[in-house]
Amino acid sequence: MAQHKINYTQNGGLPVALTSIDKIVNWGRSNSLWAMTYGLACCGIEMMASGASRYDFDRFGTIFRASPRQSDVMIVAGTLTKKHAEFIKRLYDQMTEPKWVISMGSCANTGGMFNTYATVQGVDRIIPVDLYLPGCAPRPETLQYGVMLLQKKIRANKASRAQVAKRLM
């Protein structure tokens, strides 16, 4: 009996069911973000304010967690020193896949005004960053808008297609 290998990647087409699965899974992921806060300086104060009742991140599905094993989003806010770099890398590695990182504020994005031997000039030199929030210190509304942008990015992800294509090859 002849066996034919089906090439699903031909013409860019995978089974149609994966598109629906992607939408459902990404909708669930985007509306249940568990964020681990890593507040290091002034931006940490604004991040704490965003967790209060006035901004109510819970209505967007974002819940702040203290453990990296319970989180899928890391929010790095403030100046990252070289001594902290090892710890932030370890915390990032403890997070389960899929995971995202938000860099909040000028100091986390580029090192800010602290261009010294002891500071890391941007979190993206240690861990991959998905979203940069500018400002010194960014207001809670900026973080709220950033979470909404991250949700939009997650909904556009094609995770199951990449996983199936990897298994079929």
From Swiss-Prot:
Family, per entry: Belongs to the complex I 20 kDa subunit family.
Cited Gene3D superfamilies: 3.40.50.12280
The EC number(s) this enzyme carries: 7.1.1.-
Catalytic reaction equation(s): a quinone + NADH + 5 H(+)(in) = a quinol + NAD(+) + 4 H(+)(out)
Classification of source organism: Bacteria, Pseudomonadati, Campylobacterota, Epsilonproteobacteria, Campylobacterales
Localisation per UniProt entry: Cell inner membrane
Primary subcellular site in the record, as a coarse category: membrane
Residues binding [4Fe-4S] cluster, per UniProt: 42-43, 107, 136
Keywords in alphabetical order: 4Fe-4S, Cell inner membrane, Cell membrane, Iron, Iron-sulfur, Membrane, Metal-binding, NAD, Quinone, Translocase, Transport, Ubiquinone
Record SUPFAM superfamilies: HydA/Nqo6-like
Protein name: NADH-quinone oxidoreductase subunit B
Pfam families on file: Oxidored_q6 (PF01058)
Cofactor remark: Binds 1 [4Fe-4S] cluster.
Coiled coil: none
Names of the cofactor(s): [4Fe-4S] cluster
Assembly and oligomerization: NDH-1 is composed of 14 different subunits. Subunits NuoB, C, D, E, F, and G constitute the peripheral sector of the complex.
A GO CC term attached to the entry: respiratory chain complex I
Keyword Transmembrane in record: no
Described purpose of this protein according to its UniProt entry: NDH-1 shuttles electrons from NADH, via FMN and iron-sulfur (Fe-S) centers, to quinones in the respiratory chain. The immediate electron acceptor for the enzyme in this species is believed to be ubiquinone. Couples the redox reaction to proton translocation (for every two electrons transferred, four hydrogen ions are translocated across the cytoplasmic membrane), and thus conserves the redox energy in a proton gradient.
